[in-house]
Amino acid sequence: MMVKVYALTTCPYCRMARRFLDENSVAYDVIEVDGFEGDEKKAVVEEVRSLTGGTSFPVVLIGDEMIVGFNKSRMQELLNL
């Protein structure tokens, strides 16, 4: 199952989501939005906005499902943990 996380390096909830995935040995791709600059950053922010309608973090994509923010119980449910 594909897992992707849009995160900010300064976001405590992003760190919690990533720590949860790491502790449960879940493979995932991470996009650190604040690691981009200029047009690249604008493009990534627009990608997040198109997914969520806003710019809240983290955005966790698990298969076809999306979680905005850190929601441990929902992540457990979607990952069958």
Which stretches of residues belong to each language-model region?
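Thioredoxin-like thiol-disulfide oxidoreductase module
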Residues: 33-54, 81
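Loop/helix-junction capping segments adjacent to catalytic residues or to phosphate/diphosphate-binding pockets
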Residues: 14, 38-39, 69
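A local structural micro-motif
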Residues: 29, 56-57
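A short, hydrophobic beta-strand/beta-hairpin element that forms part of a small beta-sheet core
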Residues: 58-67
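Thiol-/selenol-based redox modules, centered on thioredoxin-like
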Residues: 75-81
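A basic- and aromatic-enriched beta-loop-alpha substructure that forms the phosphate/nucleotide-
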Residues: 72
